[in-house]
Amino acid sequence: MPKQLKEIKDFLLTARRKDAKSVRIKKNPDNVTKFKVRCSKYLYTIVVKEKEKAEKLKQSLPPGLQVKELK
């Protein structure tokens, strides 16, 4: 069962952990973007409803992480 995070800061801290493997970004037609980070035990998700915040969050991801964009 995935864990849903509410705060962007918590998501960024989770993405910077050692056991974080990859991030998937899923964009819906109605300007809802979901970020999913795969860690060793859980899949952590966050839902961003604003396009500007989603772009900012995408640029804030750690550079060593594998990022895959889904449509």
UniProtKB/Swiss-Prot annotation:
Gene3D superfamilies linked to this entry: 3.30.720.90
Family of the protein in this entry: Belongs to the eukaryotic ribosomal protein eL38 family.
GO-annotated molecular function: structural constituent of ribosome
GO CC annotation terms, alphabetical: cytosolic large ribosomal subunit
Swiss-Prot/TrEMBL keywords: Ribonucleoprotein, Ribosomal protein
InterPro entries: Ribosomal_eL38 (IPR002675), Ribosomal_eL38_sf (IPR038464)
Domain of life (superkingdom): Eukaryota
Official protein name in the record: Large ribosomal subunit protein eL38
Keyword ATP-binding recorded: no
Magnesium as UniProt keyword: no
A biological process from GO: translation
